[in-house]
Amino acid sequence: VGIAQANFEWIGAIPAMVLAALVFIPLYWRAGVYSIPEYLGLRYAPSVRVVAALITSVFSIFATGVALWAIALTLETYTGLPIPFGIVVMGAVVGIYSISGGLRAIAFTDAVQVAIMFLAGLVVVWIGLRETGGLADFAAALERANPTHLQAFLPADHPDFPWPGVLLGLAVVLSPAYWCGSQSILQRTLGARTAWDASAAMMFAAFGKTLVPLLIIFPGLLALVLAAELRYPDMALPWVVKHLLPPGLSGLMFIALIAALQSTIDSAINSTALMIVRDIRGVLGRRTVPDGTRDLVLGRRISIAILLGAMAFAPFVGHFGGIYQLIQTLLSLFQGPLFALLLMGALTRSATPRAGLVALVTGVVLSAALLGFGINMLYVAFLSFCYALVVIAGVSRLTPPLPATALDRLTYRRGSAVTDQAAPGPAK
């Protein structure tokens, strides 16, 4: 895909992260929730909470499997270890520290991992440009190899990332749905000391995203220029690390690669276990007061089950093409309707509980049908989002809303500034 992949960071991350910091994170803190499905349950109905948690949990299991496969592929490229062996070993390693340590361990390890990734990535860029004769020679070689890789926006008939789909499906739907409504992302902000800390962290992360495309896309372009023969496109980065960098730096970057993928896994395991315990079992079991010790034990057992399910799925990931496209396709199944619920629930007081449930369930069914007919994932996300908006508006006119008093802390109000008060957010 080339430089066009950067749209998933610049267009597909930074604006949505700012939106999350200014609107949705303060809203979640004021609502006093621990998870995104919990907010949807308060804003709409407990049934919406269960369905949203179930859909998100299933996706997280698949996403964890994708990350495990990517780690195993990196190990095979760098060390020659078989992919099945890498899946089992890394699944056990990540499971031990994420299950035993919880969110605090995840936050600490992620902070270290990010530092390693950025430092090692900058070194890859510097050495890569030096080896190819500088930026001008690198661009010329890339132009000869594949001119489309220098295009920021691909043609409208591109099978994977057409420019209208990027602007509509990515910028309008998939990006804000992920950064404003993903439990694995927002669990860190919901676990911060104060609402101000949570929003400030998201804004700081948005600034860091400006450099991410350079660190992610450049190694793939470098592998193309150097005429690397790769079995999978996802082998580009570990190939560059192994064949271009000197031993010490190569090992550092290898650790950074593993760390980045581990971050995806530990976040998914922790957030999914939380949703299953609180948002699915808690609602279906009609529990009003959480049982801390019992929930902790259950959460660890569920985490093990999630990891085993992901390990079972991981060997099949290679049959679906690139991992990035696979993840976006899975997200397009449900993020259109889910973001419609979040947007209408946060910005309006008219969306009703019945409307939210109908829009979410039928919207996911519509997305699956559209993907089944071969429609591009980006268009699927946008069409299902628009459909869900229409359903919410229509059904809300026919069904009763929540009491006005219940909506005061569940809808966005202008002037509700982010403060350093810890009280509005969930108990820490």
Regions found by a protein language model. Name each.
Residues V1-K428:
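Membrane-embedded helix-loop-helix hairpins and adjacent transmembrane boundary segments
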